[in-house]
């Protein structure tokens, strides 16, 4: 299997869910073995370049933020990263004129639509995979995430909220190609009781029912059109997981299981994997 990029550039406008700032984002084709690169076009210097890598993740509070050595950062990259993973885009340059990726409708679907509109181009280089060779586990209180060796990528994810609107939900995922149909349109969510506090901390400045599922104090869904799926919450957590894990630069070949995962836990798993060179190897499709 070959690496792929976009056939042509594609752009969108939107606001950041936390910053509330309106930005333009463009996804452009990139050469083989480039990976995913973000460029802050509002910063006119060579310091505006950030590789979308797990080791550049600088903040995981409510979203995933990447930064470079010059303290230039881009936040809320996970929904776009999930779309790139789900569409099997290995190489892309992402130009953005602000500090946060637009939230769009709160899911990955608008980014998937953009990529599909641009088209995909196969490249003259083999696609790489990260194959897990031993059991790896990360735990924080009652939250855990672990991966074990497997010949295929599988994910089993469970979430557990005290809110009756969410409760305990479980989802198993075994086919990357089904991401765009079954996972990509699952939206982010939040509780109305937290809004004032988040806004006081400079977060959720752009949040609305147009880009997030809102849950009130009586555990009712406030969005006029309700949910897209009965288990939309766990689907979105799975979306976040894929986006965060794609900061390793490849698709992971492993059986992955998670309970009450978070952006922090997702990133910690990658650090744990790459801290032990005997726990993984990079392979091509012919070596799987």
Swiss-Prot record:
It is an enzyme of class 3 (hydrolase). GO terms for biological process: lipid A biosynthetic process. Zn(2+) binds at residues 79, 236, 240. GO terms for cellular component: membrane. Keywords: Hydrolase, Lipid A biosynthesis, Lipid biosynthesis, Lipid metabolism, Metal-binding, Zinc. Its EC number is 3.5.1.108. The keyword Ligase does not apply. The keyword Transmembrane helix does not apply. It comes from the Bacteria. Its cofactor is Zn(2+). It catalyses: a UDP-3-O-[(3R)-3-hydroxyacyl]-N-acetyl-alpha-D-glucosamine + H2O = a UDP-3-O-[(3R)-3-hydroxyacyl]-alpha-D-glucosamine + acetate. GO terms for molecular function: metal ion binding; UDP-3-O-acyl-N-acetylglucosamine deacetylase activity. Gene3D superfamilies: lpxc deacetylase, domain 1, lpxc deacetylase, domain 2. The active site is at residue 263. Pathway: Glycolipid biosynthesis; lipid IV(A) biosynthesis; lipid IV(A) from (3R)-3-hydroxytetradecanoyl-[acyl-carrier-protein] and UDP-N-acetyl-alpha-D-glucosamine: step 2/6. Belongs to the LpxC family. Catalyzes the hydrolysis of UDP-3-O-myristoyl-N-acetylglucosamine to form UDP-3-O-myristoylglucosamine and acetate, the committed step in lipid A biosynthesis. This is UDP-3-O-acyl-N-acetylglucosamine deacetylase. It comes from Rickettsia africae (strain ESF-5).
């Amino acid at each position: 299997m070959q690496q792929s990029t976009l056939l042509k550039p594609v752009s969108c406008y939107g606001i950041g869910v936390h910053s509330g700032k309106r930005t333009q984002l463009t996804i452009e084709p990139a050469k083989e073995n480039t990976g995913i690169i973000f460029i802050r076009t509002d910063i006119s210097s060579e310091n505006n370049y950030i590789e979308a890598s797990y080791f550049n993740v600088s903040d995981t509070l409510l979203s995933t933020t990447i930064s470079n050595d010059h303290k230039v950062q881009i936040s809320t990259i996970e929904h776009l990263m999930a779309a790139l993973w789900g569409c099997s885009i290995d190489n892309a340059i992402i130009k953005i004129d602000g500090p946060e990726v637009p939230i769009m409708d709160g899911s990955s679907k608008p980014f998937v639509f953009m990529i599909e509109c641009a088209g995909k181009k196969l490249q003259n280089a083999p696609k790489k995979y990260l194959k897990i060779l031993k059991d790896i586990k990360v735990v924080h209180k009652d939250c855990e995430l672990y991966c074990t060796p497997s010949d295929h990528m599988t994910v089993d994810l469970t979430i557990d909220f005290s809110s009756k609107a969410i409760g305990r939900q479980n989802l198993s995922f075994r086919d990357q190609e089904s991401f765009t149909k079954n996972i990509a349109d699952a939206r982010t969510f939040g509780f109305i009781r937290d809004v004032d506090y988040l806004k006081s901390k400079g977060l959720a400045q752009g949040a609305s029912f147009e880009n997030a599922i809102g849950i009130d104090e009586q555990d009712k869904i406030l969005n006029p059109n309700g949910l897209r799926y009965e288990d939309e919450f766990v689907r979105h957590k799975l979306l976040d997981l894929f986006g965060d894990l794609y900061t390793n630069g490849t698709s992971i070949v492993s059986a992955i299981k998670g309970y009450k995962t978070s952006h922090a836990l997702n990133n910690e798993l990658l650090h744990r994997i790459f801290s032990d060179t005997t726990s993984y190897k990079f392979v091509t499709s012919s070596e799987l």
